[in-house]
């Protein structure tokens, strides 16, 4: 039986930060026909200077920047930095120029780099950071991939790199997209029973599968056609491949929005109205979604064919909680 009262520790993680203002909700309904409505202007937590206390976990606040980026303020080798929380990436990745300002670069022992790794067909150098902290959470020393990439915005909106699944999985992160909080487990003996109490809060639980490539996917269906979506907090908008929609006979219209992929290629994003998208057993409210010629690396994760990318706009609107301990996605 479900408890009559939600345990305080779990309630802190489930509790919403407030309703989306009606005007902004209307803008989101047409986000692709005109422009992307910034999540950063949606309702914020009541007291953002205070992080909630949950036994066995440390909470780190994030904020939303331009293009729906979930940004976590961190310290890299004691230097302030901003990292994109990205469940679509396996690694910690830093912009090469930004890394140099943090003292992260070639090995001082004569070797140029610690090693190299291939990401989406690119061979990239691996360096080492001595320390990484976020709020009161200390992640210690970590390998970091260096990549030349365009910097995003200025000031607080600037992103210096990516915080990927390497860290998020190691610390069994629970990401609440709506309340702008990421909980990291520090006591491995504790485990929250999110599934039981989430149902009483009218969340729908969808199992997350980790593919051989490391990607996180969830089941979906459109027009009765089943498939899998890549759960990607680094994607600013939920997007489907144009070939998939053409096969379903779904029409789409051009927009002024474009998306840039890690390889540096940019694709124009079209929009399509979808009224019957289901993620697991959760029926997504009718909305316009992105349609683009997605790169091959995004459409195939190991032996799994990907039907689309579940991006931050839908995750936020549907109050998403991504539980990397229980491996479940909660939506409502």
Residue ranges of predicted features:
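Pepsin/retropepsin-fold aspartyl endopeptidases
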Residues: 42-332
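Short non-domain terminal segments
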Residues: 4, 12, 37-40, 137, ...
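N-terminal secretory signal peptides that target proteins for export/translocation
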Residues: 1-22
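Short, flexible coil/linker elements and helix-boundary hinge sites characteristic
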Residues: 18-20, 38, 249
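Bacterial N-terminal signal peptides
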Residues: 23-38
């Amino acid at each position: 039986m479900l408890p009559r009262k939600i345990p305080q520790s779990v309630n802190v993680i489930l509790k919403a930060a407030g309703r989306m203002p009606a005007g902004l909700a209307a803008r989101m309904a047409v986000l692709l026909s005109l422009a992307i409505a910034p999540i950063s202007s949606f309702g914020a937590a009541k007291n953002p200077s205070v992080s909630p206390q949950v036994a066995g976990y440390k909470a780190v606040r994030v904020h939303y920047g331009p293009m729906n980026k979930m940004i976590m303020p961190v310290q890299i080798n004691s230097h302030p930095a901003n990292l994109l929380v990205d469940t679509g990436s396996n690694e910690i990745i830093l912009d090469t120029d930004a890394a140099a300002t943090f003292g992260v670069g070639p090995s001082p022992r004569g070797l140029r780099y610690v090693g190299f790794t291939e990401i989406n067909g690119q061979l990239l150098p691996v360096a080492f950071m001595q320390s990484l902290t976020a709020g009161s959470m200390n992640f210690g020393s970590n390998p970091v991939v260096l990549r030349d990439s365009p910097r995003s915005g200025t000031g607080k909106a600037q992103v210096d790199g990516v915080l990927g699944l390497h860290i998020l999985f190691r610390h069994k992160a629970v990401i609440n997209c709506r309340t702008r909080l990421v909980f990291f487990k520090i006591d491995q003996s504790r485990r929250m029973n999110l599934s039981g109490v989430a149902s009483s809060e009218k969340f729908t639980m969808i199992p997350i599968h980790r593919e051989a490539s490391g990607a996180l996917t969830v089941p979906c269906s459109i027009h009765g056609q089943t498939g899998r979506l890549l759960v990607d907090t680094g994607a600013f908008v939920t997007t489907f491949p144009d070939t998939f929609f053409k096969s379903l006979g779904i029409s789409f219209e051009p927009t002024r929005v474009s998306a840039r992929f890690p390889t540096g290629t940019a694709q124009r994003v079209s929009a399509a109205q979808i009224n019957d998208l289901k993620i697991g057993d959760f029926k997504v409210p009718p909305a316009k979604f992105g349609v683009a010629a997605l790169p091959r690396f995004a459409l195939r994760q190991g032996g799994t064919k990907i039907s689309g990318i579940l991006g931050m706009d839908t995750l936020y609107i549907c109050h998403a909680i991504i539980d990397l301990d229980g491996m479940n996605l909660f939506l409502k």
